[in-house]
Amino acid sequence: MNILENINTEKRNPRSLNLDSMSIAEAVSLMIDEEYGVIEALKEQHRNITEVILATSYSLRNGGRIIYIGAGTSGRLGILDAVECPPTFSVDYNTIVGLIAGGEKAFIQAQEGAEDAANFGKEDLQSINLTAKDIVIGIAASGRTPYVIGALEYANSIGATTVAISCTKQAKISKYAKYSIEAVPGPEVLTGSTRLKAGTTQKLILNMISTLSMVSVGKVYQNLMVDVKPTNQKLIERSKNIICEVTGVDYTTAEKFYLKANKSVKVAIVMILNNCDYEKALAILKNNNNFIKS
């Protein structure tokens, strides 16, 4: 039985049949043109993406976590998105978690066969003490990865919300999830190499999930990352510039309040806008569910 026969990501792209005889310039043009399929795939899934973000936002507001889980490129993309959230939004590293078949070492070196064991998906979720408050997002371009299916089955069994993200229609993993996103950008230029368009598609979906979920819990004011964690000189300067941008104060004043606010951009802004001290600013934010109210 050919288990890959009807999977979109395994189909040949008629536009790249002569890839091996194209000039580099021709191949570059082709690969650029092929990326347009990514945007069309995302537009077609607008409603489903929206539903997923509403679900992830609900989970975060109610004490849950977002758990990405996948194998290979899909797993790496989940980790990549997850690890960027603490410095960008000052969330705990346990708020958005990325899990990959084969463990952390699989991020830099393929672990043969890890994705084929459904029980590994279950065990990885058990290792982080998954609860019913969490939302598990299974990612598999092919839509059939056993590791992901095992994870979704376990998540369902304990009452956690489940999501399946794939790049093929009628994906097998969709059957194991409450919500599904089947964004199909078309066959790859290099047949079956889902690190290409499928990977780009998945990354953009994860970008939307994490960013807009953070917006929903007050981590953003207007379009500014007011909960940025100042972990390097660039982010320290960005923090001060954000304070200037929102409040209209000069750089020196922004720097003074930044230090008074214990290097919290959000608290500094509230202190300036409300002409109050640090403790009062914290109380105002708590009363507003951690949102800056203009």
Curated annotation (Swiss-Prot):
Role played: Specifically catalyzes the cleavage of the D-lactyl ether substituent of MurNAc 6-phosphate, producing GlcNAc 6-phosphate and D-lactate. Together with AnmK, is also required for the utilization of anhydro-N-acetylmuramic acid (anhMurNAc) either imported from the medium or derived from its own cell wall murein, and thus plays a role in cell wall recycling.
Organism whose genome encodes this protein: Francisella tularensis subsp. holarctica (strain LVS)
Family the UniProt entry places it in: Belongs to the GCKR-like family. MurNAc-6-P etherase subfamily.
Quaternary assembly: Homodimer.
Pathway(s) this gene product operates in, as recorded in its UniProt entry: Amino-sugar metabolism; 1,6-anhydro-N-acetylmuramate degradation; Amino-sugar metabolism; N-acetylmuramate degradation; Cell wall biogenesis; peptidoglycan recycling
Catalyzed reaction equations: N-acetyl-D-muramate 6-phosphate + H2O = N-acetyl-D-glucosamine 6-phosphate + (R)-lactate
Gene Ontology MF terms in the entry: carbohydrate derivative binding; carbon-oxygen lyase activity; ether hydrolase activity
Active site: E84 (proton donor), E115
InterPro entries associated with the record: Etherase_MurQ, Glucokinase_regulatory_CS, MURQ/GCKR, SIS_dom, SIS_dom_sf
Class of enzymatic activity (EC top level): lyase
Protein name: N-acetylmuramic acid 6-phosphate etherase
Keyword Lyase: yes
Miscellaneous: A lyase-type mechanism (elimination/hydration) is suggested for the cleavage of the lactyl ether bond of MurNAc 6-phosphate, with the formation of an alpha,beta-unsaturated aldehyde intermediate with (E)-stereochemistry, followed by the syn addition of water to give product.
Keyword Lyase: yes
Keyword terms, alphabetized: Carbohydrate metabolism, Lyase
UniProt-listed CDD domains: SIS_Etherase
EC number from the UniProt entry: 4.2.1.126
BP-aspect Gene Ontology terms: 1,6-anhydro-N-acetyl-beta-muramic acid catabolic process; amino sugar catabolic process; N-acetylmuramic acid catabolic process; peptidoglycan turnover
Alphabetized SUPFAM superfamilies for the sequence: SIS domain
